Regions:
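S-adenosylmethionine
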Residues: 1-146
């Protein structure tokens, strides 16, 4: 394992690593709505315009990160948001714009690793009122094989 931390989509290493990585984790900047129970003041700073701006940034980061996995490699997209616009919306638009990419079932992948089933269908979803944690979203995407 050789971890690489790439802080932004314009990092010079992106070109060198394109198509060579087994797995990429995108910890996308988000509203943090999944942390409202610990940070209740967030609700006063969120606006539709701020969410739209973050969704555009998340989409750009995900598209840029999609260049990195090798054929058959995986891309994990995660946020600490509960907003569908930042989660399923970003992933759905990515899948529509990138033919061949497959959305895998995160709960099934975790179950094969012995982790209790957590999620809703194909996504990993931690909900504060259900799991007693901050809210979290995760999606596992697989690049088409060569």
């Amino acid at each position: 394992v050789h971890p690489e931390r790439i802080a932004h989509e314009n990092d010079a290493r992106v070109k060198r690593l394109t198509g060579k990585i087994d797995a990429v984790l995108v910890d996308a900047p988000c509203t943090g709505s999944g942390t409202l129970r610990r940070n209740p003041d967030l609700k006063w700073r969120m606006s539709p315009a701020a969410v739209d701006e973050l969704v555009a940034k998340q989409s750009a980061i995900l598209a840029s990160a999609a260049r990195l996995p090798k054929p058959g490699g995986r891309l994990v997209y995660g946020t600490c948001s509960l907003l569908p616009e930042e989660n399923e919306g970003v992933v759905d638009r990515f899948i529509a714009a990138h033919p061949g990419w497959t959305l895998l079932s995160a709960p099934e992948i975790l179950a094969r690793q012995g982790v209790e089933s957590i999620g809703d269908g194909r996504y990993l979803k931690l909900l504060p009122h259900v799991h007693g944690t901050d809210g979290f979203f995760g999606a596992v995407l697989e690049r088409p094989a060569a």
